[in-house]
Amino acid sequence: MKVNRITLWSVDLTSHETYYMAEGKTCDTVKTHVLCLDTDSGLKGWGEVCPIPHYLPAFADGVPSAITEMAPAIIGGSQFGVDAPMRKLDGVLQGHLHAKSVVDMALWDLFGKASGQALYTLLGGRTRADMPLY
């Protein structure tokens, strides 16, 4: 299974109301990025990242440039598994974890689909019967 196309959508998400954060910061619109990795086998892997630059050490408008920089290392490579492709990307572009995270999610999605297993199984399996939230 090899990735033969990368598509990235950038979308502004506007809240119905202003969101109030710590330190008096507010946010009413954030930019999110949705990535699709198409493969020669017909499978698609999806990822999404929504960096909020005034809250996190990330720059949303830098994601498309980072994906363009990393694309040659992604397209054409065997993508069965996640660790080796992500290590390869570290050699192409240092840092930029927010931009790499969208690729990481899409690779995990592909890995799960290709292996026919749920993502939680690939990440170590179910460890509890239920999960209390609060």
Where are the regions a protein language model picked out?
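N-terminal amphipathic alpha-helix/helix-capping segment at the start of soluble metabolic enzymes
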Residues: 1-13, 87-91, 113, 117-130
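Hydrophobic faces of well-ordered beta-strands that scaffold small-molecule active sites
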Residues: 45-47, 129-134
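Structured beta-strand/loop patches that form or line metal/cofactor-binding pockets in enzymes
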Residues: 1-46, 50-57
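Broad gene-expression machinery/nucleic-acid interaction feature
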Residues: 32-34, 102, 130-132
